[in-house]
């Protein structure tokens, strides 16, 4: 799936049965939660000028069941699907990671 901006992608996530979408990290991870972090930017350079065209986000999904429907739903809006990272003994959750590239929105910021 292609999205025009972070807000477009975020609004799509809000249609899914997630408990929360968090930009950043928390001390504890929770079931059916997506954690986002900015990982890189796509920059175009010409002469002495450069333009940020978009951003890459690292996405982490935490779920109780390995076959939770969210694994497929959120995986469909990522660049290359999921990698199963680990099973957390502390939280008893499966953690999946993936990446999504989103072009800059109208304002040009990573969260627009």
Swiss-Prot record:
GO terms for biological process: symbiont genome ejection through host cell envelope, long flexible tail mechanism. Its main location: virion. Keywords: Viral capsid assembly, Viral genome ejection through host cell envelope, Viral long flexible tail ejection system, Viral penetration into host cytoplasm, Viral release from host cell, Virion, Virus entry into host cell. One of its GO terms (cellular component) is virion component. It is found in: Virion. Belongs to the skunalikevirus head completion protein 2 family. This is Probable head completion protein 2. It comes from Lactococcus phage p2. The lineage of its organism: Viruses, Duplodnaviria, Heunggongvirae, Uroviricota, Caudoviricetes.
């Amino acid at each position: 799936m292609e999205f025009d901006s972070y807000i477009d992608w975020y609004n799509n996530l809000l249609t899914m049965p997630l408990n929360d979408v968090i930009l950043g990290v928390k001390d504890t991870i929770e079931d059916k939660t997506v954690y986002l972090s900015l990982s890189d930017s796509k920059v175009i350079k010409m002469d002495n000028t450069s333009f940020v065209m978009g951003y890459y986000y690292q996405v982490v999904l935490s779920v109780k069941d390995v076959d939770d429907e969210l694994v497929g739903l959120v995986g469909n809006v990522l660049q290359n699907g999921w990698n199963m990272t680990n099973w957390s003994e502390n939280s008893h959750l499966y953690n999946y990671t993936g990446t999504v590239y989103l072009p800059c929105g109208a304002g040009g910021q990573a969260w627009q």
